[in-house]
Amino acid sequence: CRLLTEEGYRAQLTKVGQDPLRKDADVEALWAKVHKSRRSIGSLMMDQHLYAGVGNIYRAETLFRHGLSPFLPGRDVSRETFDATWTDLVDLMEYGVQHGRIDTVRPEHSPEAMGREPRKDDHGGEVYVYRRAGLPCYVCGTPVAERVMEGRNLFWCPTCQPAP
């Protein structure tokens, strides 16, 4: 921990990526970096110099909700899909802050709608793929897959999120 001057603080802020919870996030700057990158979208979303504060759960869940393979290169993500995932991140993360839990499951896949038991996990929310490796996908029934990416466990559905 160190004390920063105002200039030092501003200099550090320039190293931080775009935060979906900030109204002043520069989505155009983020798009420019994602659109040029050969790195996978799953990797890019864990890069705090690009996506500030997104983290592992929101990465896995947002990619699932949009049918995006975490292995798709950033440059192959369309602008329409990029905008849709950004908007979804904003909505999901704002909901998480307001409710103190991470819920990413759409109403039609809720425990009540599907007649299933609620998820029991330490983060306390309903999710599609996060920490569900080997369990059937709520949408298609394929077992959820898991692998390490960017030093974190990545979860995805191989059917709903087909490889590029």
Where are these regions (language model features)?
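Phosphate/anion-contacting hairpin/loop surfaces
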Residues: 1-68, 73-76, 80, 85
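Short metal-binding segments enriched for Cys and/or His
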Residues: 163-164
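Short functional micro-motifs and their immediate structural scaffolds
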Residues: 144-145
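Residues immediately within or flanking Cys/His clusters that coordinate Zn2+
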Residues: 134, 154
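A broadly conserved sequence feature marking short terminus-proximal activation segments
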Residues: 72-131
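Short cysteine-rich clusters marking metal-coordination/redox-active sites
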Residues: 137-140, 157-160
